[in-house]
């Protein structure tokens, strides 16, 4: 029974976690190339600008600070790191990846660490861009800003990676416990069978209670 539960838990984790990481990877990838994170409006000239970590505006005006602030530089580094780690996590979780990365008993722990680190990188990129907007408002004066959908979508992507990492971590913590319980149960059953075999070899017969215990153990198995 424990073995079946172990397999069911592994099947659940290896089914839901790739879905979470794949969706999180797509979210981070789309948000990273989308420039409209924040909408800025100059109250004096009524000019409208859009701000993101990367400047790739086409038909709209992007805010292009020169030189680049430390917030933008670090934000780009963390966001690109999140994209790379999200891709690695998603690739490892795919079924065909077992040919390249053999699944060991520590893989759940490694995947949990990568998932948490991916979420942390994306969160730091979000915070650094927010600090850039705050510094911009203090420097340029009257600027109105409104947060656009990439902020909320990226926050949801961070949540997905936290959930995926938590599932992998729980799997890593629970499986050894089930393995120990299964081993203990198997040792008790082997000890009981050995006792009955020794008793029969000496010419004795097991009591009715021992027979009932053996039948019950076989039924459970």
From Swiss-Prot:
Listed InterPro entries: TMEM225 (IPR033542)
Subcellular location: Membrane
GO CC entries: membrane
Broad class of where this protein is predominantly found: membrane
Membrane topology annotation: Multi-pass membrane protein
Keyword Membrane: yes
Keywords on record: Membrane, Transmembrane
Record-linked Pfam families: TM225
Residues passing through the membrane, by range: 14-34, 77-97, 109-129, 147-167
UniProt protein name: Transmembrane protein 225B
Source organism of this protein record: Homo sapiens (Human)
Organism placement in taxonomy: Eukaryota, Metazoa, Chordata, Craniata, Vertebrata
Gene that encodes the chain: TMEM225B
């Amino acid at each position: 029974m424990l073995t079946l539960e172990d397999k069911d838990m592994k099947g659940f984790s290896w089914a839901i976690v790739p879905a979470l990481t794949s969706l999180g990877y797509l979210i981070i990838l789309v948000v990273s190339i989308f420039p409209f994170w924040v909408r800025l409006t100059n109250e004096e000239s009524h000019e409208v600008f859009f701000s993101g970590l990367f400047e790739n505006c086409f038909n709209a005006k992007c805010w292009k600070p020169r030189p680049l602030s430390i917030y933008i530089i670090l934000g780009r580094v963390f966001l690109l790191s999140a994209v790379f780690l999200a891709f690695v996590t998603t690739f490892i979780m795919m079924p065909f990846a077992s040919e390249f990365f053999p699944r060991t008993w520590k893989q759940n722990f490694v995947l949990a660490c990568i998932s948490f680190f991916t979420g942390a990188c994306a969160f730091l990129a979000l915070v650094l861009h927010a600090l850039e907007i705050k510094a911009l408002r203090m420097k340029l004066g009257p600027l109105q800003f409104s947060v656009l959908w990439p902020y909320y979508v990226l926050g949801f992507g961070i949540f997905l990676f936290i959930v995926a990492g938590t599932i992998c971590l729980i799997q890593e913590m629970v499986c050894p416990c089930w393995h120990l319980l299964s081993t203990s149960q198997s040792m008790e059953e082997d000890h009981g069978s050995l006792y009955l075999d020794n008793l029969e070899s000496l010419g004795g017969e097991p009591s009715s209670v021992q027979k009932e215990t053996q039948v019950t153990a076989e039924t459970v198995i």
